[in-house]
């Protein structure tokens, strides 16, 4: 018997009910109905309150389950005639076990309300009719089930736009990220070669693009790529080749420019990352390879590349995930343009920039939430699969 623990949990239960009863009652009512009286009931507030109510109840249930499991373990010890600690010893043992969780609890609660809560709220919005024409509090929202998902995949303009945007998003992610990784690796190997002099100076110069804030670099490139007065056309391409591509207004050339800018922005980080790994590879590997008569390509394929990928695979995967959601470059360069006839997204819009336009330009919150869920699902699945396939995580026991 543990009367002190029972008393504490009883007080906690009574306090929880007395403090949160009204909040939970309104929260669960609002979660199911989303309000009944326009202008009086704000469906957004009711949805948020309902989600918080669920989180509070889940927290209380978890504490109750922990209490039950602890009581079960104590009963097992009692049935085995094991020594039962006195209350003071139990309190010390409990403190020792729970102290690490106590330290991380503020961060955990912050994570729940900064990350988990918005995700659940977005998930809820995806199943409502929240758009410009019935936005609360003037109107109350309604649950529409999977209608928004059906709209995305069955109605012509939405389906065409979605597949066009996701195709470009995948091309953009794979091409831009792979090129920046390849360039970073190539430069790191060249600079790390023993015959190259002035390595510190060269490395400093190559890392400089990373030191400049990316939005400043993007705005500079916007001016350089301007169709009418940009230096790239007027001072380089037109005098030398007699051509002046429409970098901002032609879909193909806009995509080429975006990929080029991202390679410029992204390769310094990869270069610095690979440089550190290359310097950590023991020279004994290369000396042994030289004794065996290995060529430069064989040393790269069998020594350099495996070492680099093993050490940096998780970070490289995050590079792909980051570019998949690279909103800043797409929006600052030309806001996803130029426009495409018959679609509600620009020719260079990726999924994340399309979500921004749907939400803040067209106030189509429900469809923006649907696309956001698809983005999260794609990134999570791909990242999880790739992480599990990397040697780094396999050696740590996997996921």
Q: What is each model feature region?
A:
Residues 23-29, 100-399:
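A structural signal for multi-pass alpha-helical bundles of membrane permease subunits
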Residues 40-47, 51, 91-98, 194-197, ...:
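Juxtamembrane loop-transmembrane helix junctions in multi-pass integral membrane proteins
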Residues 2-11, 98, 166, 174:
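Membrane-interface helix starts
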Residues 1-2, 363:
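Short helix-adjacent coil turns
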Residues 4-93:
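Transmembrane helix recognition focused on a "late"/terminal membrane span
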Residues 65-103, 197-199, 387-399:
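Transmembrane alpha-helical segments of polytopic membrane transport and secretion proteins
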């Amino acid at each position: 018997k543990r009367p002190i623990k029972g008393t504490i949990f009883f007080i906690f239960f009574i306090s929880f009910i007395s403090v949160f009863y009204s909040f939970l009652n309104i929260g669960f009512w609002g979660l199911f109905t989303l309000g009944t009286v326009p202008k009086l009931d704000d469906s957004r507030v009711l949805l948020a309150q309902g989600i918080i109510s669920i989180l509070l109840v889940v927290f209380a249930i978890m504490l109750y389950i922990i209490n039950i499991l602890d009581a079960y373990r104590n009963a097992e010890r009692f049935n085995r005639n094991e020594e039962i600690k006195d209350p003071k010893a139990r309190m010390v043992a409990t403190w020792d076990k729970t102290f690490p969780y106590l330290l991380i609890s503020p961060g955990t609660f912050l994570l729940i309300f900064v990350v988990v809560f918005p995700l659940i709220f977005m998930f809820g919005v995806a199943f409502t009719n929240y758009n410009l024409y019935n936005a609360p509090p003037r109107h109350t929202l309604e649950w529409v089930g999977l209608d928004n998902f059906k709209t995305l995949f069955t109605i012509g303009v939405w389906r065409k736009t979605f597949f066009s945007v996701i195709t470009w998003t995948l091309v953009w992610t794979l091409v831009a990220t792979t090129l920046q990784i390849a360039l970073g690796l190539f430069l790191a190997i060249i600079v790390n070669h023993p015959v190259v002099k002035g390595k510190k100076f060269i490395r400093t110069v190559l890392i400089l693009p990373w030191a400049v804030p990316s939005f400043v670099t993007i705005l500079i490139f916007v001016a350089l790529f301007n169709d009418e007065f940009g230096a790239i056309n007027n001072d380089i391409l037109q005098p030398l080749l007699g051509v002046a591509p429409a970098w901002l207004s032609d879909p193909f050339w806009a995509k080429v420019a975006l990929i080029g800018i991202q390679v410029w922005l992204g390769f310094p980080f990869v270069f610095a990352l690979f440089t550190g790994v290359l310097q950590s590879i023991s020279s004994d590997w290369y000396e042994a390879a030289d004794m065996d008569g290995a060529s430069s390509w064989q040393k790269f394929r069998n020594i350099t590349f495996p070492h680099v990928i093993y050490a940096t695979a998780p970070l490289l995967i995050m590079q792909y995930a980051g570019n998949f959601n690279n909103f800043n470059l797409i929006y600052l360069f030309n806001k996803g343009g130029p426009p495409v006839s018959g679609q509600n997204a620009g020719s260079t819009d990726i999924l994340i920039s399309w979500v921004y336009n749907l939400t803040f330009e067209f106030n189509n919150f429900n469809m923006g939430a649907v696309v956001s869920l698809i983005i999260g699902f794609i990134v999570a699945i791909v990242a999880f699969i790739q992480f599990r396939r990397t040697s780094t995580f396999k050696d740590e026991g996997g996921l």
